[in-house]
Amino acid sequence: MYQIVRTEKADNQLRDLIYYIADDSVSVDVALNYLDKLEKAMMRLSEFPESGSTPRYAILRKQGYKVLIVEKHLAFYKVDHTNKVVTIYAVVDSRQEYRNLI
């Protein structure tokens, strides 16, 4: 099993996303259910760290990122096989230009 770690940036992006969903849907339950879905998907990486896709941008591929797709959101991460750690660097909306958000 791999340890899952999120950077401060990823935590902030995730928090902002959940606040936005709660505000937009006028339902905290909708936001919390989506957070649960995202976190479950990220936790599955502890057992299947290579299950993410290859990013479409070459610069991200060259830097060793993988991407986990959850509905309209992307979680960018790297796998450290030596230390058995998956580090999540960013959680972004797939519809925005995200190269500079990671």
Per-region residue spans from a language model:
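Arg/Lys-rich, positively charged N-terminal/basic patches that mediate binding to nucleic acids
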Residues: 1-37
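PIN-domain endoribonuclease scaffold, especially VapC-family toxins
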Residues: 5, 33-42, 62, 67-69
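Acidic/proline-rich low-complexity IDRs
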Residues: 13-16, 59, 100
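Enriched for short, Lys/Arg-rich terminal
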Residues: 25, 70-74, 78-102
